[in-house]
Regions:
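Periplasmic c-type cytochrome electron-transfer domains
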Residues: 35-465
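Short linear interaction motif-like sites in intrinsically disordered regions of transcription factors
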Residues: 8-11, 21, 298
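N-terminal signal peptide c-region/cleavage motif recognized by signal peptidases
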Residues: 30-32
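Bacterial N-terminal signal peptides
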Residues: 20-28
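N-terminal secretory signal peptides that target proteins for export/translocation
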Residues: 1-14
């Protein structure tokens, strides 16, 4: 039985870079050991909090799909940067394993966007380790975009540690977003550059597939429509969430919990659902209680370790839903609402029920890219407003590189909050190494005043999503 399951896994994973096959088998052995959590049509991998699981509506995980095929000229597939074991993203520990296994020649290590700068020396092992340092340490891909021709700003200086210092075509470094739970997306890409006015999600994902194959995979010819359709169909089949917690156990309907990917699949959603800014077409008022999947755990009694872990998750859900936050200085939110101070909650920006992204497009600047938070491995862009002369510095102009608007500097979307435990580090630039770092960022940025207990509970909850 075990051999047959391993053989099936090999078949599923064979078109993914071979080190991931090895990692997948190792993880699957741990998965088999948890026989009580095996489900039909569910693929699970161990992560730092327990087990991440992906459910496919197709009834299988088709390794022959173009998503898993090399369609360009550099050996990459979509799966190169969207791994099941990493919640359909990619993480530094597994990237480092691939580097060590292949001496830095795995397809993810390509200079076009895997290196800190495309001109980096990759002639020796040490040179490759240096050239791909952001990818290895933070899982960052270089994104190069031209300053829009109609921009109302000028990039007057670039301080890039890797000599990619053009002021007309900027190099930015961002985490690959997970290619799962896409049914809930309202914005494609961190900066929304693959979301087009008047177009539906399928159109946007199709456009993204073409651009990714042309850019990341360096394809010589465009994808056929059949290939695009097949990739998008494949992506839309996946729903991912944490299925097992190391301390609390199963999260998927056992003992009153309603976690796991199948619940995500069944979650009702529509554009604007629960939007606090008036975008809900149903007219139903905003409800800050975004998550209810662990409600029944809040009344548990018992002093054993597992019960205490469940109670911590339930308390963390309550913290997420109910702790008030004084939201100030968030471009794209406070200024748009005309309110210098908005008394809100986590769900003010993460409002989609039991999913956690914003249910309408909402690019905002919460300060992650502020120059004050720069680390030595990040660039700094000095940008001047062509009309007012105002000058700002940022580590990533964000949405402004799409719209050409000075007011959009530093704006990004808020991602879906499912499957977090499997895909550290966090934020667009990987600046938060852990979920506790994420919580600390918000606590400091908005002067929330979390207690240590609240922080620990919130981390436990976020890790259970």
């Amino acid at each position: 039985m075990l051999a047959r399951k391993l053989g099936s896994l090999w078949s599923r994973m064979k078109n993914i870079t071979y080190i991931y096959v090895a990692v997948g088998i190792i993880l699957f052995l741990g998965y088999v050991a948890r026989a009580d959590v095996l489900f039909e049509n569910l693929l699970g991998f161990l992560d730092t909090s327990g087990q991440i699981q992906t459910f496919s509506t197709a009834g299988n995980f088709d390794d022959s799909n173009p998503f898993n095929q090399s369609l360009g000229t550099n050996g990459r597939t979509c799966a190169t940067c969207h791994q099941q074991s990493d919640g359909l993203s990619v993480t530094p520990p597994h990237i480092q394993a691939r580097f060590d296994q292949t001496n830095g020649t795995d397809p993810i290590f390509r200079t076009n966007d895997g290196a800190n700068c495309p001109t980096a020396d990759v002639s020796t092992l040490d040179a490759r380790r240096s050239a791909y340092s952001l990818l290895l340490n933070k899982g960052l891909i270089r994104i190069e975009l031209p300053v829009p021709a109609n921009a109302d700003f000028t990039v007057i200086a670039v301080d890039n540690p890797y000599t990619c210092s053009s002021t007309t075509s900027l190099s930015m470094y961002r985490r690959p977003l997970p290619s799962t739970n896409l049914q809930f997306l309202t914005t494609v890409m961190w900066d929304g550059r693959e979301s087009f006015p008047g177009q539906d999600l399928r159109f946007n994902l199709s456009h993204q597939a073409q651009d990714a194959t042309a850019g990341h995979a360096q394809a010589a010819v465009p994808l056929t429509q059949a290939q695009v359709d097949s990739i998008v169909d494949f992506e839309l089949e996946f729903f991912t969430a944490q299925g097992v917690d190391n301390a609390a156990g199963r999260l998927d309907g056992v003992g009153g919990a309603f976690g796991g990917p199948q619940v995500v699949y069944n979650q009702q959603s529509f554009l604007g659902i629960n939007d606090p800014l008036g975008g809900n077409p149903s007219g139903v008022p905003f409800d800050p209680k975004i998550f209810n999947i662990y409600d029944q755990w809040s009344s548990l009694t018992g002093t054993d370790t597992q019960t205490q872990a469940k109670l911590a998750i339930a308390r963390g859900q309550q913290v997420f839903n109910s702790i008030p936050i004084s939201i100030t200085g968030v471009a794209g939110l406070n200024d748009v609402a005309g309110q210098p101070r908005i008394m809100g909650f986590c769900g003010t920006c993460h409002d989609t029920p039991n999913v956690g992204n914003h249910s309408v497009p909402l690019p905002i600047n919460i300060g992650v890219a502020d120059v004050s938070r720069r680390t030595p491995d990040m660039p700094v862009f000095t940008i001047q407003n062509n009309t007012t002369g105002e000058v700002v510095q940022t580590t990533d102009p964000g949405r402004a590189m799409v719209t050409g608007k000075f007011k959009d500097i530093g704006k990004f979307k808020g991602p879906i909050l499912r499957g977090l435990a499997a895909r550290a580090p966090y934020f667009h630039n990987g600046s938060a190494a852990t979920l506790l770092d994420v919580v600390n960022f918000y606590d400091t940025r908005f002067n929330i005043g979390f207690t240590q207990q609240q922080k620990a509970d919130l981390v436990a909850f976020l890790g259970s999503l």
